Each structure stands twice: as structure tokens, then as C-alpha cells.
Amino acid sequence: METTDISDQELNKWIGSIKELPEWVKLYKLNHHSPSQINTADDMWGYKYLYLNQEERRLLPINSKMISGICVGEMGQYEIGKIIWKFIKGKGLVKQEIPKTKKIFDKAIDFFNKYQPETDDDKLSHQENKKGLALAYHQLKAALKEIGLKDPVECERSVSLDLPGCQLPVIGRIDFEDKDNFIELKTKWYKKNRPRKDGTQSYSVPRIEEGYLGWQEHLLQVAFYYLATGKKPHLLVLNPESYNIFTPDNCEDLKPKNLKNLINKMKIVAKRREEIMEKHAGKATWVQDIYPDFKHFFWRGMGDHLTQAIKLWGHA
């Protein structure tokens, strides 16, 4: 099982064909926004996208929950996907058939087992998540069957959206879609509870009812794909024990009028960051306009990067 590696050159060509970009884009080598960027706090965004280059970003620490989420996403592609979109050098954005296989879970567990946790907490988390991966696959199959996308189901298609008053496009890739519907898939994995009285550790699955931790961020991502495609949204959230499917039919937040309201939040964040990039024009002085919060959970597990960031802001 492999993660998709986008050709930078082909992606840049595609973005360039969408919209004429300002000169300062070349200075920071950042030519688009994305839903995940917009959901990231300004200090973490600045460190990742204005300070680090793309190769350095690819080496940022990951954890077992991220690996587990990748596994479930790719199991979904093999389960219902017919087409996957990829950027191919010299060809641009192209469709490729997803090969059929009966060993969907075997591929996932092989990929899962290749990950080597670096901290004791992540090692314990990885052990728990391994127990839950097969259960999560069961939940995934049931949920995808309930949603019932029609063939041919496509995966990872890149779409763009221009925000009012912003110079850069917002780019994102759709998890699963058919002619009239799309699915945004989110996974929740075991969280560590307080130690028992005897000192042993226990884990529990996080809640996935409406309003769960991360709900607002996920709504923004769904809103982006809805506004970019006009298709009916399905927010599929699962853990190893259950799943929930949120649509405009059962969730007020996913009704078109409420999703459209989120465009203003996207615009505010994107425009603020564009103004920072334009003002500082490639210089590291952008830190003057972004206040860091190193106690935020985003910085947990960042290792040496946290030390670098503290020095970057002059807090050492």
C-alpha cells in the first residue's frame, strides 16, 4: 500500500492553468490554500509552509492514528473505487483504474506494520490501533454499503475554489465521489484514559456523535468540497466500534445554506495569510505578524521542530 506522491511540477502547471498567481508566490513557493491548511493554526501553518520547504514537510513526524487513517482510506478505495486521479509527470492530472484485489485488508495491515513508532505513547497507541484496524474495516464496509455510491466511483480527484477577494485558489482532493454525491471520510482511534489505580493503562474510542472533537474543522472541509462540486455531501465518521453518516437530510450543519456560510471563514483565514506573504515577500519577518501558541496540542509530538520553532520566534 502506497501513499499518493504528487508531482510538484505537474501540480504547479495545473494550478497555473486555473488562475494567474502573484509574484510573491515564487518567494515562498506556496501557490494555493487547502482545507487542511485553513484548519491549521496560523503559527503551525507559518512554520510548515513559510519556513519549511516541501521536502522538509514530507519528513514531519507522523503517528499511529495518521497511519491507521491512511489504511482505512485506501481500504475504501479498493472496496468501492474504480478510478483514482493522480498527477503524472509529463501527463498532468490523469485517471487510473484501481486494480481489483481480494486481499484488501492484507494490503492494509502490511502497510500498517511497516510503521515504526518513535515514542512509548505512540507504540502503545499503535498496538491498540492494530487491534482495531479489522474492526474499523468492518465499519467502513457497512457504511459505504449504506451510502451506496453508484459506479464508477472516483477517488482523489483534485478540485479548486476561488474565494472572494483572495489571490490564491483553494485546492483539495475528494475522498470518494460519484456523479451526484461525495464522501468525506474521517476516522477516530483509541484514546488513552487516565491510568487505573493499579497503574495499568486503558483505552477507549472517542465519540463520533454530532459535535465531536474536530467537528467544526470537518464541516469546513465538507463545505469546501460542496462549494467546489455542488454534489450532495456525506460526512462519514467511524471508529472501530461504530460509524455515523451525516448528510443534509439528518444534519442541520450540512444543509447548503449553512455550508455556504463557512466560505466567509475560509476567506478570512486565506486573505489574512496572503496579506502576510505579500507584506514580507519571502523574508522570515512574517513571524512578527503571527503570535505562536506552543502549548497548543498541534505542537505535541513535533520533537526537534518545536525547538526550531521556538528559536524562529525568538522565544528561546
Regions found by a protein language model. Name each.
Residues E154, E177, N181-L185, P233-V237:
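A structural signal for short, well-ordered beta-strand segments and their strand-loop junctions
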Residues S160-D162, K188-Y190, P240-Y243:
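Short, solvent-exposed loop/turn segments at secondary-structure junctions
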Residues G76, I80-I84, T187-Y190, F224-G230:
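Hydrophobic/aromatic-lined pockets within catalytic cores
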Residues P61, Y203-G214, C251-E252:
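Short histidine-centered catalytic/ligand-binding loop motif
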Residues M1-I174, D178:
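Metal-dependent nuclease catalytic cores that hydrolyze phosphodiester bonds in DNA/RNA
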Residues P195, G214, L227-A316:
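Metal-dependent nuclease catalytic regions and adjoining charged, substrate-binding loops involved
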Residues G211-Y225:
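Short, charged, amphipathic alpha-helix that recurs within catalytic cores of restriction-modification
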Residues V72, G172-E209, F224-Y225:
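Conserved catalytic cores of phosphodiester-cleaving nucleases, focusing on short active-site segments
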